[in-house]
Amino acid sequence: MIKIANAPCSWGVLEFDLAEKSKEKGFQEVLNEIEATGYVGTELGDWGFMPTEPIGLRKEIQKRKLELVGAFVPVDLSNKDKHDIGVVNALKIAKLMSDANYNESFIVLADDNGSNFERTLNAGRVEKSMMLSEEQWKVFAHGTEKIARAVIEKYGLRTVFHNHCAGFIETPEEINKLMELTDPDLLGLCLDMGHYAFGGGDPLVAIENHKERIWHIHFKDYDPLSAKAAKDEGEDYFGALKRGVFCELGEGIVDFQSIVSLLKKLNYKDWIVVEQDVLPGMGNPKNHAIKNRNYIKTLGL
């Protein structure tokens, strides 16, 4: 049975070091609103956003009758010198989830999105010249496997890779390449529908192409008009976020009805996590969460 979660990023709790960080909501308010709006799971958010000791973490999550389903771990994977600290950070988070008895949770690995100027400026319009070289691909793939292997060997948790704009694994071509270069038993795919659409792809095609690798799913919609406005004004990824490029579910161009039909056909039974990435202080996250949950109900979930 597919279960529906939400995540702190829908409340503006993002991994980026932004001026708007001061507007972030506290974890108790976020968890209260996730529960109140009809979701049954959450992801962890940034390290330190929620309690970082297992008893306290489990107490807060159980208090709201939620499950912890994953934790986002950004790593500069194209830089070999950053792999070891990536392992350390992933193991720190995996230990917390394991010690809190969330043994089905995923490490949601990603590039260090937003750190590369060219990729951040050109989110949604990446050209071939902006992609990794063959040598960089080897380094990147090695880093993902190194982290995933360390996590499963030490704590038994699985790792999925999150496609994401403003990072090196954004386009369908890049996602295909990473899946080709990595062990299918070691690394799964966290397919984010909105980022995939923003990156120039059709999520339905991605599901068909990677159905054996998709272990975790993020539901996010995409508004191409906001993306075009950002492009026309020379704005980067964060400018597109401010314009609402990731709109409420059903308001963009992602065909969720067909996606759900295909997932059911493929017998997908894991979590779907709603992520409506917004900057801290943007909009009314609780209202967005209500509308997104109501929309998902129209899909039979």
Language-model features and meaning:
Residues 9-11, 45-47, 73-78, 110-114, ...:
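Active-site beta-loop-alpha junctions enriched in small/polar residues
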Residues 43, 70, 106-108, 160, ...:
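Conserved beta-strand positions in the central sheet of alpha/beta enzyme cores
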Residues 251-265:
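A short, acidic, amphipathic alpha-helical segment used as a generic capping/interface helix at domain edges
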Residues 67, 82-189:
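Active-site acidic/histidine proton-transfer and metal-coordination neighborhood
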Residues 273-287:
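A short, acidic, flexible beta-alpha connecting loop/helix-capping segment that sits on the rim
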Residues 19-23, 115-125, 227-239:
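Short, flexible, mixed-charge acidic loops at enzyme active sites
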Residues 42, 137-253:
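Acidic/histidine-rich catalytic cores of soluble enzymes
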Residues 1-103, 134, 138-139, 145-146, ...:
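N-terminal pre-domain/capping segments
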